[in-house]
């Protein structure tokens, strides 16, 4: 997009397409919708890492080795009600029949560092999680770049800065300490996002789009709006279906 060629990729995830294309959409020639059965079991595996880079490396390996994983999320230990010993947590979410999830948990525990353990999913989060969801700045990048981007963003911030990174889509949520400083935050991040070919957006703010146009004048957003419209058509009830709409 933006001078690039949009390739045909069978089985591409709607959420990944919205993030991976930087919000700009090519011409859709054909759409195939595959409906998957409702999962009978929901669970996950949680592991701790000393650095974001280590967690991202492990997450990328899992993504490539186990394409049926429901979600792979990286977040600071401070967002967990029962923190891991390491400062960075990696949560792998599983959905499916009990036989499948039981076998996957064993495989993941062998793949992840010692100290990883099975957990419920979704797991209870601390109050800081609500702060991220209410006022967070959403940033999307190619999954292969989001680890380096997040590491750079965190370099200039205090330990425990709230963030949530979804490895499968390349989308992350940040919660600046002072939500009134979003415009300064966006201007500070603009060169960094441009270097990593990423974009940022804050929802629930009627003035955000006008400010975004000043901060990121080169970005085009009509594609993201179109993808959101498609998602709303497929899921009018607003039920979270990450990784469940295959195109």
Which positions does each model-derived feature cover?
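Hydrophobic side chains in well-ordered alpha-helices
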Residues: 1, 55-62, 101-105, 149-153, ...
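Short amphipathic beta-strand starts and helix->beta connectors
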Residues: 27-32, 65-80, 123-125, 155-162, ...
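Active-site-proximal beta-alpha loop/turn segments in soluble metabolic enzymes
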Residues: 35-45, 85-91, 169-173, 208-213
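Short gly/pro-enriched beta-turn/loop segments at secondary-structure junctions
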Residues: 12, 39-42, 67, 84-89, ...
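Conserved glycine-rich FAD pyrophosphate-binding loop
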Residues: 110-247
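FAD-binding subdomain of flavoenzyme oxidoreductases
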Residues: 1-68, 73
């Amino acid at each position: 997009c933006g001078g690039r060629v949009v390739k045909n990729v069978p089985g591409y995830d709607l959420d990944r397409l919205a993030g991976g294309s930087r919000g700009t959409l090519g011409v859709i020639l054909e759409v195939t919708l595959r409906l998957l059965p409702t999962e009978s079991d929901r669970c996950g595996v949680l592991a701790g890492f000393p650095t974001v880079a280590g967690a991202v490396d492990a997450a990328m390996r899992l993504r490539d080795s186990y394409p049926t994983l429901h979600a792979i999320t990286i977040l600071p230990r401070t967002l967990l009600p029962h923190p891991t010993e390491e400062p960075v947590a990696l949560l792998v979410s599983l959905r499916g029949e009990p036989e499948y999830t039981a076998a996957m948990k064993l495989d993941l525990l062998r793949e992840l560092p010692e100290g990883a353990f099975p957990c419920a999913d979704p797991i209870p989060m601390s109050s800081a999680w609500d702060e991220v969801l209410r006022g967070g700045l959403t940033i999307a990048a190619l999954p292969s770049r989001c680890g380096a981007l997040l590491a750079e963003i965190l370099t200039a911030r205090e330990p425990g800065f709230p963030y949530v990174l979804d490895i499968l889509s390349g989308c992350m949520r940040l919660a600046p300490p002072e939500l009134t400083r979003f415009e300064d935050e966006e201007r500070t991040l603009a060169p960094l996002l441009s270097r990593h070919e990423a974009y940022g957006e804050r929802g629930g703010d009627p003035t955000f789009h006008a400010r975004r146009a000043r901060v990121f004048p080169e970005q085009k957003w009509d594609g993201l709006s179109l993808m959101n419209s498609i998602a709303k058509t497929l899921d009018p009830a607003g039920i979270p279906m990450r990784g469940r709409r295959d195109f």
